[in-house]
Amino acid sequence: MNVLICDDDLKIVQQIKNFLLKLSKQSTYNFDITCFSNGDSILDKQIKTDFAFIDIEMPGVNGLSVTKHLQTLNPNIIVFIVTSFQGYLDLSLIHI
């Protein structure tokens, strides 16, 4: 499975990557992981990926724009939105 991780916080990128590598060792899943530190570097590439972990708030191109781009390349992609901003959590809880 191809997995993309995009976050401007490199600690978060490493934590997600380590989690996936550990999961890969404990199961039959084999992850091919590609990491980016900003959305700008993704928009000019034709990356087809099965799963993506994307920070919603990054300098330059934000996570929503990256998600839309990746969905044009693979409409079946599964995207996990990552954020450390409390405001986004508050907004999402309103809709539960």
Residue ranges and their predicted role:
Residues 38, 62-65:
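Acidic catalytic/metal-coordinating carboxylates
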Residues 94-96:
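Conserved small/polar residues in nucleotide/adenosyl-binding loops
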Residues 59:
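The feature encodes the CheY-like receiver
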Residues 7, 55-56:
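Active-site residues of response regulator receiver
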Residues 32-51:
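Acidic, metal-coordinating helix/loop segments flanking the phosphotransfer/catalytic sites
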Residues 55, 76-86:
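A short, hydrophobic beta-strand element within the central beta-sheet of small alpha/beta folds
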Residues 9-34:
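Two-component/phosphorelay signaling modules centered on CheY-like receiver
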Residues 64-75:
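Short amphipathic alpha-helix used as the core "switch/output" element in two-component signaling
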